[in-house]
Amino acid sequence: MQVSVETTSGLERRVTVGVPAEKVDVAVEGKLQEAQKTIRLDGFRPGKVPMREVKRRFGGAVRNEVLADVMREAFIEAVEQEKLQPAGMPGFEATTNEAGKDLEFVATFEVYPQVELAAFDSIEVEKPQSEVTDADVDTMIETLRQQRAEFADVDRASEIGDRVNIDFKGLKDGEAFEGGTAEGQNLELGSGQMIPGFEDGIVGMKAGEEKDIDVTFPEDYQSEDLKGQAVVFHIKVNKVEGKALPEVDAEFMKGFGVDDGDETKFKAEVRKNMERELKNAITSKVKEQAMDGLVNLHEFDLPGALVTQEIQRMRQQMMQQFGGGQQFDPSILPDDLFKEQAERSVRLGLVVRAILDKNEIKADADKVKARVEEISEQYEKPEEVVSWVYSNPQQLQQIEGAILEEQVVDLVLESAKVEEKTMPYQDAVKPREQADG
């Protein structure tokens, strides 16, 4: 089999492959003979259609089918022979395709880039140092009370913390604008759900009252038409509800798995969960910074096919997350929406794979086992969860992948500049974007 390789641009390769005529013609003849046994045509007995007629009617389609198989098989042999690593599916084009003549075809595809790993000592990582204090536990218990608050109608002016049911209509230069009108909307005052000034304007209103409030949209508002614009909202309050917080009693604690109503046990359980959250948050922040450092350190061409695949995966994930099981038009989620993140993901994946290969890193079996047990402890029957994970290759592979990433992070941190920074619990558990903001 004759093979020639041409680099057309960047990662794109053009491979020309020659296949002996006999290999194609024999395969075509064999398929036609098989087809002859089952073809039914008017005027002929089943299985007795002359080969001449079979070739006339079906020869072209059968040859195309054979060509697809032959080109695919020959391509696999060619890339193995030339030690190429295709990224994505190739495009095939037969340049010589006649019975009795050698087949020649061209396969165009991208290859994986050669990733030259840089030193990690320029990567900077800020590692939060924090602990869960008694005050943090008390604050969390108050948050849990807020989450389980109940609202009831009150006959008084609204206050911060109340929930109001309102109708509103926004006007800009006397004209209604898109998204500025709603009826029967519930709003907790002080939640920051609406633009600045909106909720404050409702404080002090009673059920049945109406008034206009003047507000200005923030300069960074998502709508170009409304950024920095002064508008008037006509507000009608339909209902005012006061918030009633539950007592921290036996019934309340039972909802968190403390059946005997022991407050000491309850606080210990809350602290345990907070410490787990703190540990995970610190690990996540350190990992994200290390991964960002790897991405920023390595610049190389990315296979477009891999980026396209990642964009499709991200789009599908978003459709499943927000589609609510409904039919979703993918056109409202253009490629540009995902491209930057997709490129980062592909680049990071290639760098991580290069690190794993260079350092011959395999998933640490003890760490995998510990992670499986940690996950299982969150369920009622841990033993069944452990058994299920180890009998489910896809689930186990996900856990092994997470452990491999952690092992890569550990390797990076051995060389990176790591600065420990003491901070309160609330700051430590905030996502990086919020903490930086």
Swiss-Prot record:
GO terms for cellular component: cytoplasm. One of its GO terms (molecular function) is peptidyl-prolyl cis-trans isomerase activity. SUPFAM superfamilies: FKBP-like, Triger factor/SurA peptide-binding domain-like, Trigger factor ribosome-binding domain. The keyword tRNA processing does not apply. The keyword Cell division applies. This is Trigger factor. It is an enzyme of class 5 (isomerase). Its EC number is 5.2.1.8. Belongs to the FKBP-type PPIase family. Tig subfamily. The lineage of its organism: Bacteria, Pseudomonadati, Pseudomonadota, Gammaproteobacteria, Oceanospirillales. Residues 161-246 form the PPIase FKBP-type domain. PROSITE patterns: FKBP_PPIASE. Involved in protein export. Acts as a chaperone by maintaining the newly synthesized protein in an open conformation. Functions as a peptidyl-prolyl cis-trans isomerase. It catalyses: [protein]-peptidylproline (omega=180) = [protein]-peptidylproline (omega=0). PANTHER family: TRIGGER FACTOR CHAPERONE AND PEPTIDYL-PROLYL CIS/TRANS ISOMERASE, TRIGGER FACTOR-LIKE PROTEIN TIG, CHLOROPLASTIC. It is found in: Cytoplasm. One of its GO terms (biological process) is protein unfolding. Consists of 3 domains; the N-terminus binds the ribosome, the middle domain has PPIase activity, while the C-terminus has intrinsic chaperone activity on its own. Keywords: Cell cycle, Cell division, Chaperone, Cytoplasm, Isomerase, Rotamase.
